Structures are given as C-alpha cells and as structure tokens.
Amino acid sequence: YYTPKYETKDTDILAAFRMTPQPGVPPEEAGAAVAAESSTGTWTTVWTDGLTSLDRYKGRCYDIEPVAGEDNQYIAYVAYPLDLFEEGSVTNMFTSIVGNVFGFKALRALGLEDLRIPPAYSKTFIGPPHGIQVERDKLNKYGRPLLGCTIKPKLGLSAKNYGRAVYECLRGGLDSTKDDENVNSQPFMRWRDRFVSVAEALFKAQAETGEIKGHYLNATAGTCEEMMKRAAFARESGVPITMHDYLTGGFTANTSLAFYCRDNGLLLHIHRAMHAVIDRQRNHGIHFRVLAKALRMSGGDHVHAGTVVGKLEGERDVTLGFVDLLRDDYIEKDRSRGIYFTQDWVSMPGVFPVASGGIHVWHMPALTEIFGDDSVSQFGGGTLGHPGGNAPGAVANRVALEACVQARNEGRDLAR
C-alpha cells in the first residue's frame, strides 16, 4: 500500500492526512496502514483476496513529507480509485476514507487535511440546490453582501414573541432572519406555531418595505420524514428559505433535503453545529475545508464559515481558503492557505459563506473587506443587543453595511 512511484490519475480521489505515528512506527508503515485500512486492507491475508484485483481497488500512499517544525509528524498523501465510491453519496465517501482508520493503534493522531474531488466524481452530486446567482435573483439583491440576524434568546421565546422579533429586524432593514441551530420543536415553541408566526411577520415586513425578505426556518428533526414535512410546510407558507443542521442531521438527510429544495424552489441554509468537535484539534480530526467541500457536494446554498474577527476561532488565510473552496469554480493549490490540491468544481454552483458569531457594526468594514460581496453577515446579539431595540439594531447594521459598500466602491481602504 506504500507505493512512492505511483502516478496519480485524474479520476483518483486524493487525500492529505496529517499523521502522527506511535513511537517506533516508521512513517512509511503508518502511511501504508492508513491507505490499507481506508480501502481494501484488513488485519490479515484472506482467501477471498484471490477472487478480485486488489491492485485495481486498493488505496495507495504515494508520498510522505515531514511537517516543518513538528516532531514525528507527517503529511501522508493517499490516492483512492474512483470505483471504491458510490456515486452521489457523501456518506459512502466518508465511511470509506475516515470510517475506521482514525482509531488505528499504529497512530497517535490522524487528521484529514484536504481532499481532491475529481470532476468525474463531483459531477455525480446534486450540489447546492440553487447557488449564489440564483439566490440573488430570487431575492433581488445585488452588489453587496446579504445581511441577516439570528433571533435571540435562542431558546425560550413563544411563537408570537419570536415572530415579533423577526418583524422588527426585517422591518429595520435586514434581508433575512434565522432560527438558531437548536431551535427545532420544543415544548415552549412548536415548529408549526413558529413557522406560521414567522410567515406572518415576513409578509408584513415585505409589504411595508417593498423588499423581498427571508427567514431561515429550521427543518432539522428527529427523522427524515419529519424533516421533509417541515420543509414542505415552509414552502406552503411562502417563506423562501429553509434550514438544516447538516452535521448533526447527517449527510444522507441533507442531500435528500437539497433535492427537495431544488425541485420546489426553496433556498437551503446550512448550519455547521458540532463542527468543532470534528475540526478544532489540529492533529486529530477532519479539517473544516473538507467538511465545506462535502457540504458543497451534498447541497446547501449558504453555510456558516467563521468570521476571522468575531468570537469564534478562525485564521484569516485558512478561512479564506475554504471560503474560496465554497464559492469558486477553480481553486489552485496553495499550501499557505491550507489548500493541498487544486480543486476543479467544473459547473457546480457556489455556496454563500456566512460570517456569524460575536460580530457587530464595528466589524462591518473588516467583514466587507475580507469576505466581499458574495457572503452573508449574520448579526444576532449585534442586532438584538442594540440599546434602542431590535429595529434600531437592524437599521444600524444596514446603514453600516451600505456605508462600507459605498466607501469601498469609491476606492476607500476598508482595512485601515
């Protein structure tokens, strides 16, 4: 499984693993173990090996390089033949590549840093239900970032008071409001009551402002059937956007919802709740750039991507690296931004990155400069925490955004 002379094919899925072998385990042995366990290998030779062509189907560790400044840590590059994976299934891809190998005894730690998804595989996926340009057309909003707000407190409001907060924020000038990730259907506010109150608030704000408004109605539920029922009710109520927690809900459920949203004209907002459990440790886990690629394949029109400047962790260059992986068609390899492979998405639509978490109007120049127009700035406490109330908070955000966009268009340096 360690084959340093192997020449990768255009159809191979390539993986870059950050590998920390146990003391005494050579990196070549550890890299071979990763390739074997994540493809055709098992702990012994079996008789049925002779009934297939292992040479055709096995993963190959084709390169190993030491990590600069780290003791006994390496980047292992592994190539997987395309035939190992079911078409259009992120679930199967992850089950194969990361399903068992992270518990391997020969490794002290293992991190999946990046994946190269070949066009031959990415073309089998639905991708975002609509994408950046179609969303702008649906909402009739161009030339600036979109502006949103997560309704707070995230838990405890009644449906009526929740709808009131939505109305005040939309009436004040926001493009959309949002359910928090853990707002599903709790005793204090059942989902149907919330959906009805939000729809009423949204239509009232639209009538008074003359702008198209949105709210991300969280359809995440305990079963796929219940999730689809909630998404259908969101469509019937006339709210243009639904929402899913894609890591806690699962990739199979997410892809099913993405198909429904595409077929029924709903935009799909994605929250990454639980991501830090998977991606926060540098040496062990799955980097968010991999989860971002997986989301683009599974389907979502926008996804939370960190802020660089807010309360949640995120390095600027690395964050902008996976923002480009979400939005752009073709992304060149750039190790300084953590991009290990050139990625060609061909014609797959892009995904809006959402900046959210501890941001307020003071951050608006930096957010506008860092993320550009094709992004969503999501202010929760930065709207609802305004001393004058919810509507003045929304007004402040809208005025700040329009001032920053005008200054940028006039050639001002927003970074200063």
Swiss-Prot record:
The free-text cofactor remark is: Binds 1 Mg(2+) ion per subunit.
- Supply the EC number(s): 4.1.1.39
Binding of Mg(2+): at which residues?
Answer: 178, 180-181
- Which compartment or compartments is the protein found in? Plastid, Chloroplast
Q: Which InterPro entries match?
A: RuBisCO, RuBisCO_lsu_C, RuBisCO_lsu_C_sf, RuBisCO_lsu_fd_N, RuBisCO_lsu_N_sf
Q: Which reaction does it catalyse?
A: 2 (2R)-3-phosphoglycerate + 2 H(+) = D-ribulose 1,5-bisphosphate + CO2 + H2O; D-ribulose 1,5-bisphosphate + O2 = 2-phosphoglycolate + (2R)-3-phosphoglycerate + 2 H(+)
Where is the catalytic site? 152, 271
The top EC class is lyase
| GO biological process terms held by the UniProt record | photorespiration; reductive pentose-phosphate cycle
Instruction: Tell me what else is known.
Output: The basic functional RuBisCO is composed of a large chain homodimer in a 'head-to-tail' conformation. In form I RuBisCO this homodimer is arranged in a barrel-like tetramer with the small subunits forming a tetrameric 'cap' on each end of the 'barrel'.
This chain's function reads: RuBisCO catalyzes two reactions: the carboxylation of D-ribulose 1,5-bisphosphate, the primary event in carbon dioxide fixation, as well as the oxidative fragmentation of the pentose substrate in the photorespiration process. Both reactions occur simultaneously and in competition at the same active site.
Q: What is the name of the protein in this document? A: Ribulose bisphosphate carboxylase large chain
Q: Which organism is it from?
A: Cheiropleuria bicuspis
